[in-house]
Amino acid sequence: MREKWVRAFAGVFCAMLLIGCSKSDRPQMGNAGGAEGGDFVVGMVTDSGDIDDKSFNQQVWEGISRFAQENNAKCKYVTASTDAEYVPSLSAFADENMGLVVACGSFLVEAVIETSARFPKQKFLVIDAVVQDRDNVVSAVFGQNEGSFLVGVAAALKAKEAGKSAVGFIVGMELGMMPLFEAGFEAGVKAVDPDIQVVVEVANTFSDPQKGQALAAKLYDSGVNVIFQVAGGTGNGVIKEARDRRLNGQDVWVIGVDRDQYMDGVYDGSKSVVLTSMVKRADVAAERISKMAYDGSFPGGQSIMFGLEDKAVGIPEENPNLSSAVMEKIRSFEEKIVSKEIVVPVRSARMMN
């Protein structure tokens, strides 16, 4: 995969950052890694959920673990449960002189800014957010607006096939990079049919499957037949609602996020309610930059964009629920995005108002 070094996007991304959260559990710690005796250690701090959330955190952990296994290194993680625990969690790893400390998501931006100033020799990686003007911090961001455009095309085509005039979008929280998903999804939908509406629901949490299921029920009851969920653990509830309704004979679909969630939607043999997924290779970013830190080529102070032309975002290689005609349409749009014939927006119409 090829990475593009970009500073132009940093200002846009930073303008999106909204910091803050509220969680209730105490930090949970764990470890994994290569053979005993490895001196290089990567420490990962999550901002919501755990490393088995079937979404973003799990992807990052898989990338770090893969790096550790291949380089005789080790890795540890801590789940910081409140904003008050972010700085202590990062600082605890920095006190151990980690080879790299990885912060997952935009909740941790302010904590990374503070901690990186206190520990100028410690290398930090913040994933899916931007920290500027810190020589010991690398920011990995993704063109999820580009990947979301493609699943927007799939959603709109499925809606038109069913005679529907709207599709659904459920987001965990409107912060950090999250607006990019809605912007790209809406643009993809409108590229197919400008008259199809995107109905948005905000869960205000990434870790409440029951809330996700309730919001999905609301959208499906309104007549929507396809929902794109971008909500971490909350999104698992969206998938569950789709599975339950399919078992009751309703023709509804859900679009996964971050990784291929087809298997999460299986409800009858090998049948799945997951139409497709907006895959974001956070694991590749985590593995790649961990290796750079290990090799002594850590690009401190840089923001690295992983986009569609890098094959870091997009749809899975296999899409059993998409016809060849739909795939052909999606690939056509993909080529236009990569060639810059189509420039995908970073804000939706709703966000612009």
UniProtKB/Swiss-Prot annotation:
Residues the entry annotates as binding inosine: D47, N57, D128, G232, D258, K280
Homology family: Belongs to the BMP lipoprotein family.
Compartment(s) of residence: Cell membrane
Residues that coordinate or bind adenosine: D47, S48, F56, D128, F206, G232, D258, K280
GO cellular component, one term: plasma membrane
Lipid attachment, kind N-palmitoyl cysteine: C21
Lineage, opening ranks: Bacteria, Pseudomonadati, Spirochaetota, Spirochaetia, Spirochaetales
Expression induction: Encoded in an operon with TP_0320, TP_0321, TP_0322 and TP_0323 that may code for an ABC-type nucleoside uptake system, with TP_0322 and/or TP_0323 encoding putative permeases, and TP_0319 encoding a ligand-binding protein.
Record note on quaternary structure: Monomer.
Primary site of residence: membrane
Pfam families in the record: Bmp (PF02608)
Source organism (scientific name): Treponema pallidum (strain Nichols)
Entry-linked InterPro entries: BMP_lipoprotein, Peripla_BP_I, PnrA-like
Protein name: Membrane lipoprotein TmpC
Domain of life assignment: Bacteria
Membrane topology qualifier: Lipid-anchor
Role according to the record: Binds purine nucleosides and may play a role in purine nucleoside uptake. May be part of an ABC-type nucleoside uptake system. Has highest affinity for guanosine, followed by inosine and adenosine. Has very low affinity for cytidine and does not bind thymidine.
